[in-house]
């Protein structure tokens, strides 16, 4: 596309896209190469221990990711794959295959060679992905509730000791 939303390595934190910026093809960064499709998983290949990976679920395919991400197209449930690549075991295997110490990195070809255990039945992967998504949503809800309670406590303490 001539104009697109660019996602660089600072745009994704954890599994959330926090920002993106509009770019014009003629002046875009040279790393803006990976055209996103709904369902693609973008795996950060530099400092993978940060676990800044993103499952692209937007219906809009006008997003382009940096080449600092490996682009994966899941055979079944994308959330299953996201959960898998976020696991400590997977990160350890990736780090064992990285080059560099200050900024460990893995190239997309080496990443593609890493074997993972996944259900051969797509519906089973879908069910597992749905369970993981539900658990993550519940965790997020409880984290928000905890933050609200901390704010209430802080406000009460301020009023008590004024």
At which residue positions do the language-model features occur?
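Feature detects amphipathic, helix-rich regulatory segments
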Residues: 1-162
């Amino acid at each position: 596309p001539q104009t697109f939303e660019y996602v660089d390595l600072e745009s994704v934190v954890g599994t959330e896209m926090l920002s993106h910026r509009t770019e014009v093809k003629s002046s875009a960064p040279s790393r803006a190469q990976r055209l996103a499709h709904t369902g693609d998983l973008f795996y950060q290949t530099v400092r993978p221990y940060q676990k800044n990976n993103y499952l692209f679920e937007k219906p809009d395919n006008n997003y382009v990711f940096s080449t600092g991400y490996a682009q994966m197209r899941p055979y079944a449930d994308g959330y299953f794959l996201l959960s898998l690549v976020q696991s400590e075991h997977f990160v350890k295997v990736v780090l064992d295959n990285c080059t560099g110490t200050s900024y460990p990195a893995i190239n997309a070809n080496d990443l593609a060679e890493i074997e993972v255990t996944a259900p051969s039945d797509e519906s089973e992967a879908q069910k597992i992905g749905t369970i993981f998504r539900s658990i993550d949503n519940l965790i997020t809800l409880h984290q928000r509730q905890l933050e609200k309670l901390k704010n209430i406590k802080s406000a009460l303490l301020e009023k008590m000791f004024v």
